Amino acid sequence: MVLPELLVILAEWVLYRLLAKSCYRAARKLRGYGFQLKNLLSLSKTQSLHNNSQHHLHNHHQQNHPNQTLQDSLDPLFPSLTKYQELLLDKNRACSVSSDHYRDTFFCDIDGVLLRQHSSKHFHTFFPYFMLVAFEGGSIIRAILLLLSCSFLWTLQQETKLRVLSFITFSGLRVKDMDNVSRSVLPKFFLENLNIQVYDIWARTEYSKVVFTSLPQVLVERFLREHLNADDVIGTKLQEIKVMGRKFYTGLASGSGFVLKHKSAEDYFFDSKKKPALGIGSSSSPQDHIFISICKEAYFWNEEESMSKNNALPRERYPKPLIFHDGRLAFLPTPLATLAMFIWLPIGFLLAVFRISVGVFLPYHVANFLASMSGVRITFKTHNLNNGRPEKGNSGVLYVCNHRTLLDPVFLTTSLGKPLTAVTYSLSKFSEFIAPLKTVSLKRDRKKDGEAMQRLLSKGDLVVCPEGTTCREPYLLRFSPLFAELTEDIVPVAVDARVSMFYGTTASGLKCLDPIFFLMNPRPVYCLEILKKLPKEMTCAGGKSSFEVANFIQGELARVLGFECTNLTRRDKYLVLAGNEGIVR
């Protein structure tokens, strides 16, 4: 009984492969030579006059222009997205898109349409985002296994590639860890790789927006709903199991398996008995030719035509400001970039140990020289010729910095060439041990912290970061006004840090590794600019309130750095990135 069943399964598999290949070839021909049925007669009459054609707007354009040129009669089945963008430039048409068909449906895929493609055709185009989940939500071992899969991914079909990537990435991964990655890591990379031309249409229209994708739904749904305001997301659901009260992914698709976009779209719109108003597909995907054929208006995003264009969405046009994000990787982990990172890891670790040792054991001027020789670039500029020395000799200078990384006070003290004391909060024991300057922990108690900082100022110079936490993006968080009540000898310091491989901050990871990850970068950059000492009339001694002083310094630092001021706090950051208030018990 087993042998006949195996033969039947084998026969079905062979038949499926034959049909799949034949359908794929047919779709490729349809892509290159497809034309509208009603143009067949004109095609036979005019073939000798015109051998090539350009895309046109489609049936709506034909009805408004009955006297079409011969070139229009040869148009392919679906025009390019460029044609649709030209159509949107018509003011009347734009109005009709936003009102006449209100709550009609616009649908597309995120892979290769809403997001620009970066990966080679030999690998799945979504590989970098699977790698982000594997590295940030899983472990370095999982990330290495995912990278090793590239050695055979090129031999597989797209659906099989997706199954392999999903299994390696999600098998045994905690649901909680995936939630953290989708909330705090992926949105940054998705926003940076949004396709501006497709997004223009997405943002302009008031259609109900639905995304159909074969990708795991957990990978893209949060971003599409929270950042792009998608009304619905139809993707592949992954199996979950519960072990000891914790949920894990099995890495396998649940239900009917991986989503087929065209079939899911047909099922989705079957009950409404109404075709979707607009669909956009990828010209390089044969499946998309079928996928968008059910729309009233269908357009293709042509990657080949846009390779020379800059299709990245500018930061100022993000649907929501990108202020907070987490994770260690500072680059999009394509296969080659990920391979380069793993090759660099042992070298970078040894380099970080060397840089830390130099800062701890050697004099400031020697440490600066050797750090520069090892690739650390420090830009230092001061507007205080006397380094902000107080007019009265009975207290120290209070240096007020914006907060980019844990190493802000370290680079400031080495650049000034004199010892400073730094006040910190939630600093790890390891970071305290390797710090080349004195650190004092605060208790988050206003009265006690104020008294402690006053005592430290009476003994020497002090550096404080009133934001209370780091921020990677060009924004300044709200400054705590406590520092303004301590002294009138206040010197603002503008700080910026840039990395190319690893971020030296984290909200949900191990904070003790922050300085190591930062110093593992091949060429980290630190920029410090010491501003002029705050005039007495702008301090509390001159009649200003502590809030006015804090806001003034925040504004000055933002002006120098080209950053934007916000009213956000440490609590806001940790609620977004870690789901807690950032309080250390």
Curated annotation (Swiss-Prot):
A cellular-component GO term for this protein: membrane
Top EC class, one word: transferase
One GO-annotated biological process of the protein: CDP-diacylglycerol biosynthetic process
Tissue expression as described in the entry: Highly expressed in developing siliques and flower buds. Weakly or not expressed in roots, seedlings and leaves.
Catalysis: reaction(s): sn-glycerol 3-phosphate + an acyl-CoA = a 1-acyl-sn-glycero-3-phosphate + CoA
Consequence of gene loss (knockout): Plants display a massive pollen development arrest due to a perturbed degeneration of the tapetum, which is associated with altered endoplasmic reticulum profiles and reduced secretion. Defects correlate with several fatty acid composition changes in flower tissues and seeds. However, no significant change in seed oil content is observed.
Subcellular location(s) of the protein: Membrane; Mitochondrion
Topology in the lipid bilayer: Multi-pass membrane protein
Pfam families listed in its UniProt record: Acyltransferase, HAD_RAM2_N
InterPro entries in the cross-refs: HAD_RAM2/GPAT1-8 (IPR056462), Plipid/glycerol_acylTrfase (IPR002123)
EC number: 2.3.1.15
Pathway in which the depicted protein is active: Phospholipid metabolism; CDP-diacylglycerol biosynthesis; CDP-diacylglycerol from sn-glycerol 3-phosphate: step 1/3
Signal peptide annotation: none
Recorded GO MF terms: glycerol-3-phosphate 2-O-acyltransferase activity; glycerol-3-phosphate O-acyltransferase activity
Motif HXXXXD motif positions after renumbering to this chain: 403-408
Assigned keywords, A-Z: Acyltransferase, Lipid biosynthesis, Lipid metabolism, Membrane, Mitochondrion, Phospholipid biosynthesis, Phospholipid metabolism, Transferase, Transmembrane, Transmembrane helix
TM ranges: 126-146, 334-354, 356-376
SMART domains: PlsC
Entry text on domains: The HXXXXD motif is essential for acyltransferase activity and may constitute the binding site for the phosphate moiety of the glycerol-3-phosphate.
Function: Esterifies acyl-group from acyl-ACP to the sn-1 position of glycerol-3-phosphate, an essential step in glycerolipid biosynthesis. Involved in pollen development, by being required for tapetum differentiation and male fertility. In addition to the sporophytic effect, it also exerts a gametophytic effect on pollen performance.
Similarity comment: Belongs to the GPAT/DAPAT family.
Descriptive protein name: Glycerol-3-phosphate acyltransferase 1
